[in-house]
Structures are given as C-alpha cells and as structure tokens.
From Swiss-Prot:
Belongs to the cytochrome P450 family. Abundantly expressed in the female gonadotropic hormone producing dorsal bodies. Its cofactor is heme. Heme binds at residue 493. Its EC number is 1.14.-.-. InterPro entries: CYP11_CYP27_families (IPR050479), Cyt_P450 (IPR001128), Cyt_P450_CS (IPR017972), Cyt_P450_E_grp-I (IPR002401), Cyt_P450_sf (IPR036396). It is an enzyme of class 1 (oxidoreductase). PROSITE patterns: CYTOCHROME_P450. This is Cytochrome P450 10. It comes from Lymnaea stagnalis.
Length: 545
C-alpha cells in the first residue's frame, strides 16, 4: 500500500511538473477551494513550488478588481456556484457514470449547468478547469478588456505532441510575441476580403466539380453515401487552391492516394483528440493506447503537410505575380522559416477541412429539413442570374443575402465550436465575482444561441432574423456574440473568410442544381472536437429540371 501511494504521489508530481521553458505564457493555474481543499490544475505551470505544498489560501478576494457598472459588492472567486467535485480530479468521475454527463455532449453539459447555476459557474474536470459565462454582456466585457497578446488555452495534446517532436507550435497554440509575429504576417493575407475574393473563381471551379461528383455518386435513392467524407474531399480540394493554387486531386473519379491518406488520418486525429482534451494527461507519464493512436495520426498528417510545403517551397521563390497563393506569399515575405510555415499549413489544413465540412453538412441538413428556406434561397439565386443575363459568378454568389443568412443561422443552431475562451491577463470582475488573472474563462455559445430570451424561437431555422431588409432590430451585443463561433478579436479564426466564401459558393451551386430533402430520424449533434452529426446524414439530392 505504501509503495502504491508513493507511486501515485510521484506520478502526480510529474503531471504537474513546472514548465520552465515558457516564461512568457499566461497559464490557467487558478484553483478554487472546494470542500476545504484547493483544486489543483494539472496543467504545466510556471510555479516552481509543488502545488501540494502551497497554502490552500492561494486565491483570496481581490480588492482591486474593477466592478461592473451598477455593482455594489463583488463576491470572491470561491463563491462562484458550480458542481461540487473531489480534490485534484474535480467532477471527472461523474463523466464516467452511466447516467452522468458525457464528454461527447459537453455543449449540453454547459447548457444544463447554466440552467442550474446561472450565467456564471465554475467547474473542474480532471486537469481542465474553467469559469463558464452564459451572458453576452458579461463575455463582451471580457472581449473589450483584451490586451495586445490575448491568451487562449492551448490544445494541450497537440502542443505536447509538437514539443516532444520538435515541431513548431503553430499560430493556433503559440502565445505572446511569437504568436503575434506569426499572426501579423498571416492575417494580412487571410483576413482581408479582397485577398480572399481573389480566389473565388478557383473555388467556384472546385464547387462545380463537387456538384458533378455529387451527381455521379448518388445512390438509387438519390442519397450520397458517406456525405461527410465527400464534404471532406471538397473542403480539402478547395483550401488547396488558396494554400498552393493547385488541385490536390480529391474530386476525380478516383481520389488521389495522398488525399485519401490525409482524410483518413484527419478523421482519426479528431476522434482521438477529443478524449485526450479532458482526461488526466497520463500520456505525459506513459504512452497510452489512445496516445499512440493520436501520435500516429498526427505523424501522418504532419508528413503530408511537410511534403506539400517542400514541393512548393523552391518554385515559390521564383513567383512574382500579384495574387500569390499562401505559400508563395509566405516564402516571398521571408518572415517565417520552413518549419514555421509547415506548422501553419498543417494547422490550416486541419481546421479548414474539419470546420468547413462540418459547418456545410449542418447547412445542407437544415436546408433539406426546411424546404421553404431552400426555396427562398433558390429564388434569390434565380433572380440574381436574371439580372446578369442568365449567369452569375462565384464572387457574386458570395454576396447573396439569403445564403449568408442560412450560414449564420446554421452556425447559431449548430455552432461547430460550442465555446470560445480566454485566459484572462489581469484580475477582473465578471458576473459579480472576482476572477483572478490566469483564470480560464469560456463563453457558453451553444447555450446562449438557444436561449429564447436572446433568440426568439431558438430551435427553429429562421435565417430571416439576419436580413437587414426585414428591419431586424437585433441587439448589437447579441449580434456580435452570435459571431463568436469564429472566435473574436486578435485571435479570431484565421480561416473564417475562406470558410465563409467556400460555403457561400458551394451551397448556392448545390441549390442551383438540386432539391434537397431529408426523410429519416432527426440528426443530433455530438462532439468530436467540433460539433458534428451523430449519424450519417442521408440527404436526398434530386436534380432540378
């Protein structure tokens, strides 16, 4: 027994071993006193002292936290309501109970916790602990309090893998000045509408080929077997035009072996990442079966990304054209090394393929379930064609109000990222409580987007709520909160403009060519790192006459 205790104690010390190599990164290390014992984060921290030896009075009420207007008294952090948990593991064991909360339904957990505890609550799940905000106004205050280097919680398994392998952390997981340097270079190319729209013609050609492929792969019922995988192929082919300005080979009768390998490993990557995000990071002590799977998928994805970058690197140095694809732009800019560019390209391919395909399948599902919305979109496209002598460019398709509204409404109902977050840089008041610097704060997007006090008829599909022509008087704070699915501020999703352009073009072209219907049991969301359907989405694609 004594030997076992010694082993457990040693293991926990290793898990919480300080990270002395990253002194500029703000890490969420704010424990809260529960049941007389401080809840300890198992994240690598910058505290040289073992947390087990620290006083349980690590955090006390902070007197210099700024109060919100109208607040008469700010409550201490320890009084934030939330589910009771055990020392060290918090509520982790609850998630393994048959009738307990599930990691695959974390978005529903946030929603139900908010109904139980209110617009602000605290929970510790294993090594992951955070304050969850369900008020647009309160989270808006956090957004406006950001500094030059906003700190977002790193995706620990990815960061740990890359550090172990000696790879660049990438713009997604890096922090501080290093993040800012890379972000500044890339955002000039990726977040300007004018830059992204330069590739609308190529993306339109990809969408045309995708529509042809859908016609080819329809079964006898008019359905697309493995629609989600077909959307993976389309998203990968489309992002390739922006990253490399070349076709990868996903949409032919035979998908290229490289594309098949990448897609298969990408699916495995996200499925293994999800459980690693919340469980105790035991993979830092020994290589678990799940970690080995994640590592293998990551190795393969990195290898493909590296090969694509190396293939384009030297030819790019010869290019001097104005509308450079991303790698050419980065090579000619000269601010990032090959290693950094590889990390960035892999991040973009991972995010672009999974995010865009998941969002698009939800859009198609909503259109198939709501023929009246589908018809309005078709009429809008038809009228726009009539005004342009029967033709309409991919760039013009991106400007159609209804297709934009359909995408916004879909992401409200099925936010692919069910939460967005920050590690706050300084003590502040949120929801009437003192929140210490370094605390991880998340916005409960899924819960807010389905709150009837914020969005009337929240379970329905009402794209009209986003149309200015309807005289919508949506509150400015609520409207801005609705876009948090793409992140916010300086750390907004780099691929947002590209993903929106891809979806606007492709959805319009699909509705131009097909009538969609869905005649099966309702699809429910499930969490595979992102919000994805819990079953194959069997939509009937009926060619229009």
């Amino acid at each position: 027994m004594a030997i076992m205790k010694k082993f457990i104690h040693h293991s926990l010390k290793q898990l919480i071993k300080p990270n002395l190599t990253s002194t500029k990164r703000v890490v969420s290390t704010s424990p809260r006193k529960e049941q007389g014992v401080a809840a300890i984060s198992l994240e690598p921290s910058e505290m040289a002292q073992c947390p087990f030896r620290k006083s349980i009075d690590t955090f006390t009420e902070t007197t210099n936290a700024v109060k919100a207007p109208g607040m008469t008294e700010v409550q201490p952090f320890e009084r934030i309501p939330g589910p009771k948990g055990l020392p060290i593991v918090g509520t982790l064991f609850d998630y393994f109970k048959k009738d307990g909360p599930k990691f695959s339904k974390m978005f529903e957990v946030y929603r139900q916790r908010a109904l139980e505890f209110g617009n602000i609550y605290y929970e510790k799940v294993g090594h992951f602990h955070c304050v969850v905000i369900s008020s647009p106004g309160e989270y808006s205050r956090l957004v406006h309090a950001e500094r030059q280097y906003p700190n977002r919680r790193e995706m620990v398994p990815i960061a740990y893998y890359r550090k172990q392998k000696g790879f660049d952390l990438g713009v997604v997981n890096s922090q501080g000045e290093e993040w800012y340097r890379q972000r500044t270079v890339v955002s000039k190319k990726m977040l300007k509408l004018a830059e992204v729209s330069n590739f609308s013609t190529q993306m339109g050609e990809v969408s045309d080929d995708f529509v042809k492929r859908l016609s080819h792969v329809r079964d006898s019922h008019g359905e697309i077997p493995a629609l989600e995988r077909e959307l993976f192929k389309w998203a990968m082919e489309s992002i390739g035009t922006f990253l490399f300005e070349e076709r990868i080979g996903c949409l032919g009768q035979e998908t290229s072996p490289m594309a098949q390998t990448f897609i298969a490993n990408l699916e495995g990557f996200f499925k293994t990442l999800q459980p690693l995000m919340y469980n105790l990071p035991t993979y830092k002590l020994w290589s678990t079966k799940l970690w080995k799977q994640f590592e293998n998928y990551s190795d393969n994805v990195i290898d493909i990304g590296r090969s694509l970058v190396e293939k384009k690197w030297h030819p790019c140095k010869m290019e001097v054209t104005q509308n450079l694809h991303l790698i050419s732009y980065l090579v000619n800019n000269g601010s990032m090394s090959t290693k950094e560019v590889t990390g960035l390209i892999v991040d973009l391919m991972l995010a672009a393929v999974e995010t865009t395909s998941s969002a698009t399948v939800w859009c198609l599902y909503n259109l198939a379930k709501n023929p009246q919305v589908q018809e309005k979109l078709f009429q809008e496209i038809t009228e726009a064609q009539a005004k342009n002598n029967g033709t309409i460019s991919a760039e013009d398709l991106c400007k159609l109000p209804m297709v934009k509204a359909v995408v916004k409404e879909t992401l409200r109902l099925y936010p692919i990222t069910y939460s967005t977050s920050r590690n706050i840089a300084e003590d502040m008041e949120l929801g009437g409580y003192t929140i210490p610097a370094g605390t991880h704060v998340q916005a409960n997007l899924y819960g807010m987007y389905r709150d009837p006090s914020l969005f009337p008829e929240p379970e329905g599909i009402l794209p009209e709520r986003w149309l200015r022509m309807n005289g919508s008087q949506m509150d400015a704070t609520i409207k801005s909160t609705s876009q948090l699915v793409w992140g916010h501020g300086a750390r907004m999703c780099l691929g947002r403009r590209i993903a929106e352009q891809e979806m606007h073009i492709t959805l319009s072209k699909i509705i131009q060519n097909f009538t969609l219907s869905y005649n099966h049991d309702d699809v429910e969301p499930i969490l595979n790192t992102m919000l994805t359907p819990d079953r194959p989405v069997r939509i009937e694609f009926k060619p229009r006459q």
